[in-house]
């Protein structure tokens, strides 16, 4: 098998790859390194490579955080889900993940006891199929969100681009969202049933458990159960929201006293999010503008190579 390591081409990421190249030398194996050339390039590259080399056994290794993981996975799932007979029978392509410090790591939190920084542990690992959420023509591995969370993400991304730390950016993003995003008029249906009427604070549709670097939005979510976990906050007073935010961080918001009659949690296979206005849906931290989003779960759609468990 050949491994193709896909790394972010941004100049400010270069210093983080020194240890990566050292590990490649210490663990000889067939590999190539591809450096992305811009937004969406990881997805395009993986899709094109699969089209041109359908018979080749390859593991595409996403090197970084949520964004590049989503890009690489979207390329492979998009290829396998394209309707092409050869692609739909594809069983010789997988993805793996190498995490570099500083990148957002919401997705790999779902796999405790595994070292995502080690090439050696990745090579010794095994493949397991995980679910993927399809969102219109895009794909999500971890969490989709609208309302409060998307306001936090939007503001945080602006601040990170200006050089603020991820923690400071998200803290300030939360403050901004508290002041501006408590009464969103967005309609959510799950498996054909409207979740609630009236304004809402937020809604997350989750495959994994954590979003935004610190919010444990879906503590019961599993990546291989064929279901999405939907968490919905009705509009509420500022005081109640302030009481809920710490619980939302820790994953204790479901069934909590401040969340009574305000926090709704259920599972679904299909979800529709719609609004009369243009809104931003964030999937794996990436912005997707629109007014209607159709989400459905694709059970076992992504073959993911996980690092060897540290206890093995």
What is each stretch, according to the model?
Residues 2, 138-139, 185-187, 202, ...:
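Structural motif
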Residues 2-164:
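Small-residue-rich beta-alpha loop regions that form the catalytic core of phosphotransfer
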Residues 5, 33, 188, 230-232:
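Generic preference for hydrophobic
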Residues 10-11, 102, 207-210, 235:
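Short, glycine/serine-rich, charged loops/turns that create anion-binding
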Residues 54-55, 124-127, 179-181, 196, ...:
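Short solvent-exposed loop/turn micro-motifs enriched in small/polar/acidic residues
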Residues 66, 133, 152, 203, ...:
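A residue-level signal for conserved active-site and pocket-lining positions in enzyme catalytic cores
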Residues 135-227:
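ATP/pyrophosphate-binding catalytic subdomain of soluble kinases
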Residues 190-192, 197, 222, 232-312:
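ATP/nucleoside-binding phosphotransfer catalytic cores, i.e., glycine-rich phosphate-binding loops
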